[in-house]
């Protein structure tokens, strides 16, 4: 991919590839985990995952400058200089929780830190190295994985949109949808877990407004999908969402 590299504390680190048309590929078990990253932290992690390419046997350390990160995120560099410590702290302090299932039921979550290194240095930029414990979820994926171009999530303005977009993608089995689209059923509890909303917005109406509606609006605005949804109810309680998904190309 023609990348430069630098020596940092005796370790070779590679420059970020900045071509956002490249794919972010993750095992569905990683997509379906509990995640609590804020918006820019989530985007930086996905940019780091995009660096993993077919044939990689290891997760490599990377460097990205403040200016390049600002360009990726579409914000002024001054904002990144102001926020970079919060972003790196967020990534380090909020691991992903991988769902372990038995007979279709979640029995526990396994906590895995995203990174072994994520720090800013004024002379080199941001050094980031994904955790080797994530290798089964990022390297040599043959089946049960989700992929999308980085540019699709970089333009999103809500981390809930990123997470629900990934959940929908993980359940779509073909690149081209049938003419009438498809319907995807997701339990409300699973959406809450994936969006770090188990305890936020306890009233469903508030959760719908703040999370589901915001996500669906963003997905419809910036992706190839047209999404609406209906409910699965048990008595008066909404226990699941049926996402109705079709192709919608933006001209």
What are the language-model segments listed below?
Residues 1-251:
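Charged, alpha-helix-forming regions
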């Amino acid at each position: 991919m023609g990348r430069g590299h630098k020596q940092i504390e005796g370790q070779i680190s590679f420059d970020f590839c900045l071509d956002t048309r490249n794919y972010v590929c993750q095992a569905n078990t990683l997509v379906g985990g509990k995640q609590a990253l804020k918006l820019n932290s989530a985007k930086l992690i996905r940019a780091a995952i995009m660096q993993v390419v077919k044939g990689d046997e290891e997760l490599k350390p990377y460097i990205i400058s403040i200016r390049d990160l600002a360009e990726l995120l579409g914000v002024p560099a001054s904002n990144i200089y102001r926020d970079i410590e919060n972003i790196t702290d967020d990534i380090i302090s909020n691991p992903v929780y991988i769902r372990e299932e038995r007979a279709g039921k979640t029995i526990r979550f396994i906590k895995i830190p995203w990174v072994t290194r994520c720090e800013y240095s004024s002379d080199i930029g941001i050094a980031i190295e994904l955790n080797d414990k994530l290798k089964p979820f990022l390297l040599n994926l043959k089946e049960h994985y989700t992929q999308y171009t980085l540019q699709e999530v970089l333009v999103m303005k809500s981390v809930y949109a990123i997470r629900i977009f990934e959940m929908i993608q993980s359940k779509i089995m073909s690149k081209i949808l049938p003419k009438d689209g498809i319907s995807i059923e997701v339990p409300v509890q699973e959406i809450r877990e994936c969006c770090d909303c188990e305890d936020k917005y306890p009233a469903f109406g508030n959760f719908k407004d703040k999370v589901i509606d915001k996500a669906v609006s963003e997905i419809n605005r910036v992706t190839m999908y047209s999404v609406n949804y209906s409910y699965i109810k048990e008595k008066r309680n909404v226990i699941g969402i049926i996402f109705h998904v079709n192709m919608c190309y933006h001209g």
